[in-house]
Amino acid sequence: MWLQPSLSLSPTPTVGRSLCLTLGFLSLVLRASTQAPAPTVNTHFGKLRGARVPLPSEILGPVDQYLGVPYAAPPIGEKRFLPPEPPPSWSGIRNATHFPPVCPQNIHTAVPEVMLPVWFTANLDIVATYIQEPNEDCLYLNVYVPTEDGSGAKKQGEDLADNDGDEDEDIRDSGAKPVMVYIHGGSYMEGTGNMIDGSVLASYGNVIVITLNYRVGVLGFLSTGDQAAKGNYGLLDQIQALRWVSENIAFFGGDPRRITVFGSGIGASCVSLLTLSHHSEGLFQRAIIQSGSALSSWAVNYQPVKYTSLLADKVGCNVLDTVDMVDCLRQKSAKELVEQDIQPARYHVAFGPVIDGDVIPDDPEILMEQGEFLNYDIMLGVNQGEGLKFVEGVVDPEDGVSGTDFDYSVSNFVDNLYGYPEGKDTLRETIKFMYTDWADRDNPETRRKTLVALFTDHQWVEPSVVTADLHARYGSPTYFYAFYHHCQSLMKPAWSDAAHGDEVPYVFGVPMVGPTDLFPCNFSKNDVMLSAVVMTYWTNFAKTGDPNKPVPQDTKFIHTKANRFEEVAWSKYNPRDQLYLHIGLKPRVRDHYRATKVAFWKHLVPHLYNLHDMFHYTSTTTKVPPPDTTHSSHITRRPNGKTWSTKRPAISPAYSNENAPGSWNGDQDAGPLLVENPRDYSTELSVTIAVGASLLFLNVLAFAALYYRKDKRRQEPLRQPSPQRGTGAPELGTAPEEELAALQLGPTHHECEAGPPHDTLRLTALPDYTLTLRRSPDDIPLMTPNTITMIPNSLVGLQTLHPYNTFAAGFNSTGLPHSHSTTRV
């Protein structure tokens, strides 16, 4: 700020007026001479003009912003529902000083609050200002380039200042800067990179930060399950953006060999999926996965055809031929498509990434087990109270949860996620048992805490820990954190812990510049200090793959108190020790984050869920149709009179009985929902005893046959068989063993002989049902490398129409990693 000089003499009016004009003119000249010219940069597609923006903090240097840079051609008209193409070139200098339009979306209908960050759902009116003018021409990115080395570029002398002549150690990057590409979150239905300002992170961490838009919802993830509309356009947009970055970031001073992709929530799920796709190979080297995973129940849509049909019904395009259906959908306006309210099963998504055999070749857990992501350095973690939004609606005025509401919440969770009408009782009671604090079971506040922990563990912690285990199993660099801090604001209850999305403002340095419209927090010095710590960890990881170096934790320039993180060394994660960093005001390295609950969800629950099937397996392979959980949502009444919008799965026709006594009618007054008639297990017990006795009898017979055969062999040397018998001896010699094998395997073979090989019941070991539990109750594995054809009848024989060929020549459909796998050797 320029200050006017003071004069000791009192000039005459004329002289004073002339002096003021002269000083004003000189001030304008000085401002113009000191103001940096607008930065320009060349790219492979043309020149860009950005803007140099100062930041409201003395420790942050200015940042060059290039906003609205096209990374792909507009996906409009016939290009709707197709992979992106490179952007066209332009002549002259393109102005890149304004945010681009956002992709079409609708936040005015019911949004899935449980999947969205708190700062998003609490500020929907503010969010609406960012998406006022959506446009299908939305594939743009924003680039934030630091112009000076941030405060983290030097290791300060003992006084931590530069004004006394102490010599500071220069630890800045001597060459090109690391690049951090942020994938915004949401629920695959909403969001934009324009909401996140990367300036502070870029300036403080001395890295280039990029945010981007990608197609969301119907336009980004609609799939017909075949070549007509294969889906995953939103993921392909992200891949195209990474391709643009790797080819052009050097013009901005960035290092294409040090690109880190990071995201939170659904953005983290996208990052996790990108590490598993061979299309991403070579486009980035590191990934930061914040509060999300490809293993979460909502990361992948296992029923794309179902929701596409629902959409086609609503807009009058439901025809049998999928090519005609997609052509019809292309004729509809984007507004008409995104305004259709199609609600998925709870804990799942209607439009999201699909297993197409190419972009996502197989189930994410299978790909992780095959090592498809081992070539990437990965840092991941969760927040302490991610499940806040699942519980907030059932908390009473005294900040507690009643026993009835607790029971209802668990039952609703089991009904919606597991869905089958039989075999749920044991599972439901076991979950309630595991999440009851038996030392304080009647305390409503304790019930609230354990209920939040239930949803946090199932939807975030277990998928993240399993992802970390699979990645670190072969020594790939892995770092795990648990975030335990949040800012003070009115966006959520006072009793809440660090909820979903609460780490985002600290990652982007919001506390350093003060509250914003999306983060209206009362930031303290502790918040500023913790934000500096987080940005140092994140940018260190982007620079070296190690969050501990090259820049040490040093924040005395912010806070007079000692930074406890200076004494903490963030250890690598491994499946045995499972070390993780507790990020909070009292940091420490701990081990085995919520290990008991993770083991419960990973190992015990899948078997409890299928106990009924194991003991009641019929002799036919015909499966009872699962319940449909995607009918229009309705308001369910709870015993205390509160309402909870949900979608209870309908009972399967094989089990439903409309006139059965005790059947629930939505028009009746709500009574105790969880009171059930005592169940008589005598029949099941009798059948079990009978089967056990039969197996015992068969084993006795088998043992007798074996003993008889052994005794017969002992006496054989004393006998000389006749030539006729001698010729048949080999057959007789093997018959008892074959009979024994038949007796031992008889029950299994008999139970499954009518079914195909893949449906054979194996009683020797419990099958792994964890993949099933991520799918909605009525999911059927639709697309895997071994089963998918992705070619409708009307398209058989057509040649490849696009460079993103889902089934190129030599497509590997085996269970082994692809020939182009990113598996680390």
From Swiss-Prot:
Region (Disordered): 151-172, 622-668
Keywords: Cell adhesion, Cell membrane, Disulfide bond, Glycoprotein, Membrane, Phosphoprotein, Signal, Synapse, Transmembrane, Transmembrane helix
Top-rank taxon, per record: Eukaryota
Extracellular topology ranges: 35-686
Signal sequence region: 1-34
Listed Gene3D superfamilies: alpha/beta hydrolase
Gene Ontology biological process terms from the UniProt entry: axon extension; excitatory postsynaptic potential; inhibitory postsynaptic potential; long-term synaptic potentiation; modulation of chemical synaptic transmission; negative regulation of dendritic spine morphogenesis; negative regulation of excitatory postsynaptic potential; neuron cell-cell adhesion
Glycosylation sites: 95, 522
Transmembrane segments annotated in the record for this chain: 687-707
Disulfide-bonded cysteines: 103-138, 317-328, 487-521
Null allele phenotype: No obvious phenotype, but mice present subtle behavorial changes with reduced ultrasound vocalization and impaired response to olfactory cues. In addition, mice have reduced brain volume. Mice lacking both NLGN1 and NLGN3, or NLGN2 and NLGN3, are viable, but have impaired breathing, drastically reduced reproduction rates and striking deficits in raising their offspring. Mice lacking NLGN1, NLGN2 and NLGN3 are born at the expected Mendelian rate, but die shortly after birth due to respiratory failure.
Tissue expression from the record: Brain and arteries (at protein level). Detected in heart, brain, spleen, lung, liver, skeletal muscle, kidney and testis. Expressed in olfactory bulb and olfactory epithelium. Found in olfactory ensheathing glia but not in olfactory neurons, and in developing peripheral glia.
Phosphoserine PTM sites in chain numbering: 722
Cytoplasmic side: 708-825
Molecular function (Gene Ontology), one example: neurexin family protein binding
Main location: membrane
Membrane topology of this protein: Single-pass type I membrane protein
Biased composition (Polar residues): 622-633, 654-666
Subunit structure: Homodimer, and heterodimer with NLGN1 and NLGN2. Interacts with neurexins NRXN1, NRXN2 and NRXN3. Interaction with neurexins is mediated by heparan sulfate glycan modification on neurexin. Interacts (via its C-terminus) with DLG4/PSD-95 (via PDZ domain 3).
Protein name stated in the entry: Neuroligin-3
Lineage: Eukaryota, Metazoa, Chordata, Craniata, Vertebrata
